[in-house]
Curated annotation (Swiss-Prot):
Name the UniProt record assigns to this protein: Argininosuccinate lyase
Keyword presence, Amino-acid biosynthesis: yes
One Pfam entry name: ASL_C2
GO cellular component: cytosol
SUPFAM superfamilies given in the database record: L-aspartase-like
InterPro entries reported for this sequence: Arg_succ_lyase_C, Argininosuccinate_lyase, Fumarase/histidase_N, Fumarate_lyase_CS, Fumarate_lyase_fam, Fumarate_lyase_N, L-Aspartase-like
Pathway: Amino-acid biosynthesis; L-arginine biosynthesis; L-arginine from L-ornithine and carbamoyl phosphate: step 3/3
GO biological process annotation, one example: L-arginine biosynthetic process
Reactions listed under catalytic activity: 2-(N(omega)-L-arginino)succinate = fumarate + L-arginine
Originating organism: Alcanivorax borkumensis (strain ATCC 700651 / DSM 11573 / NCIMB 13689 / SK2)
Major place of residence: cytoplasm
A single GO molecular function term of this UniProt record: argininosuccinate lyase activity
CDD domains: Argininosuccinate_lyase
Alphabetized UniProt keyword annotations: Amino-acid biosynthesis, Arginine biosynthesis, Cytoplasm, Lyase
Length: 464
């Protein structure tokens, strides 16, 4: 072999160079180099441990650590020359280290494989991203709570089947969004427990013959513990799948919220005004103000769902241990993280800026016989069985549809034609305020309950 397999770090066994197209097809450096910080961090910890167990001298350790620090600066200053011929982030950095410090650089890989190295890098990278995502969740959730508290008594229609159902408060509706995101954040925190385990030391698949101290490396890297089985450590990507499942659920919730915002900002609803900075216009229609942020988040949900399916499909037929298939884990994971981060950031800025059109909301709740259930409950309290009261109110609604009158707009004599149990005090329960205030229990839409729920939610966020 004349070119030493293009100076590849694994070229000793080969007698000819890799085909140029195959080299480009199998290289991952164009996307996995975003993990350079984690790769360097892991290598510095590995070198520290190797020196402590006597595999490296202190001088060799120091040369490696300083050399890696200089390489990080080269990368961050845009001076590093990435090579597709060196395949990935790991071999690019190791080759540059050897260029800088000589044969000592070739000792760094003692006691490890790219298999456990890349598994460690991904976990370190995802752990860093989870911290950012956690802050973004908190920012959005706190914004929701602030808005819910402010709108605790703002009345709007509650919907089922997108038809007016019962009056609720806008604050109560916002807290429903909050509850979705609360569960998503809990899933993120739970996912972190399984992300934060260290594969390093598993080597290729069976461990290593060197006297390594995995617990020490684990401590240096801030992992909660080591992966207990070397085969499993290098081969499974369930932690990435779990993250994508959490991300897909979160995006699904953001998509549901987006759908409501798109509807509510339309001229037909006009419940909400979205500030101009979150909208765009039309190239042909001068009047248009398009809710692009929620529309785009709704659209991006599909790609995150797709990334989850990609990773599940990637893993489903792989025998133990590592296979080249796993190179395909990174791009779906990276994009799922990027998409979720962007969506949470956009919502974190947009939600607190929502401007409700309170009178429009209230008028919409007044239409559509939203207090029909309240009238049925009123009759039950008069001693009428619920199914009978349901039928009575149904007839009253039919009359109201014919006469174009809401229940609260009918006279007492009109209402009494459906039941002689109806008295003057019926109008107390037919008001929108009376309807929402009557649901005065935990989880109910009464303004006092909304404020209490906000207080509990704030306390819970402060304690997690």
């Amino acid at each position: 072999m004349t070119d030493k397999q293009q100076n590849k770090l694994w070229g000793g066994r080969f007698s000819e160079s890799t085909d140029q197209f195959v080299q480009e097809f199998t290289a991952s450096v164009n996307f996995d180099r975003r993990m350079y910080r984690q790769d360097i961090y892991g290598s510095q910890a590995h070198a520290t441990m190797l020196a402590e167990v006597g595999v490296l001298t202190d001088e060799e350790r120091d040369a490696i650590i300083v050399g890696l620090r200089e390489i990080q600066l080269e990368i961050e200053n845009g001076e590093f020359q990435w090579s597709v011929a060196l395949e990935d982030v790991h071999m690019n950095i190791e080759a540059r280290l050897t260029d800088k410090i000589g044969i000592t650089g070739k000792k760094l890989h003692t006691g490890r494989s790219r298999n456990d190295q890349v598994a460690t890098d991904i976990r370190l990278w995802l752990r860093d991203e989870l911290l950012i995502l956690e802050e973004q969740f908190l920012h959005l959730m706190q914004g929701l709570l602030n808005l819910a508290e402010r709108e605790a008594a703002t009345i709007m229609p509650g919907f089922t089947h997108l038809q007016t159902a019962q009056p609720v408060t806008f604050g109560h509706h916002l807290l429903a969004w909050f509850e979705m995101l609360k569960r998503d954040r809990e899933r993120l925190l739970d996912c972190k427990k399984r992300v934060n385990r260290m594969p390093l030391g598993a080597a290729a698949l069976a461990g290593t013959t060197y006297p390594i101290n995995r617990e020490r490396t684990c401590e240096l890297l801030g992992f909660d513990g080591v992966c207990e089985n070397s085969l499993d450590a290098v081969s499974d990507r369930d932690f990435a799948i779990e993250f994508c499942a959490m991300a897909a659920l979160t995006m699904t919730h953001l998509s549901r919220i987006s759908e409501e915002l798109v509807l509510w900002t339309s001229a037909q609803f006009n419940f909400i005004n979205l500030p101009d900075r979150f909208c765009t216009g039309s190239s042909i229609m001068p009047q248009k103000k398009n809710p692009d942020v929620p529309e785009l988040v709704r659209g991006k949900t599909g790609r995150v769902n797709g990334h989850l399916i990609s990773l599940l499909t990637l893993m489903k037929s792989q025998p133990l241990a590592y296979n080249k298939d796993n190179q395909e884990d990174k791009e779906p994971l990276y994009d799922a993280v990027d998409t979720l981060k962007g969506s949470l950031r956009a919502f974190g800025d947009m939600i607190p800026a929502l401007e409700p059109n309170r009178e429009v909301m209230r008028e919409a709740a007044r239409r559509g016989f939203a207090t029909a259930t309240d009238l049925a409950d009123y009759l039950v309290r008069k001693g009428i069985a619920f199914r009978d009261s349901h039928e009575i109110v149904g007839k009253a609604v039919a009359y109201g549809v014919e006469k174009k009158k809401d229940l609260g707009d009918m006279s007492l004599s009109e209402l009494k034609q459906f039941s002689d149990q109806i008295e003057d005090n019926v109008f107390e329960v037919l008001t929108l305020e009376g309807s929402v205030s009557a649901r005065n229990h935990i989880g109910g839409t009464a303004p006092d309950q909304v404020r209490a729920a906000v207080a509990r939610a704030r306390e819970a966020l402060d304690n997690t």
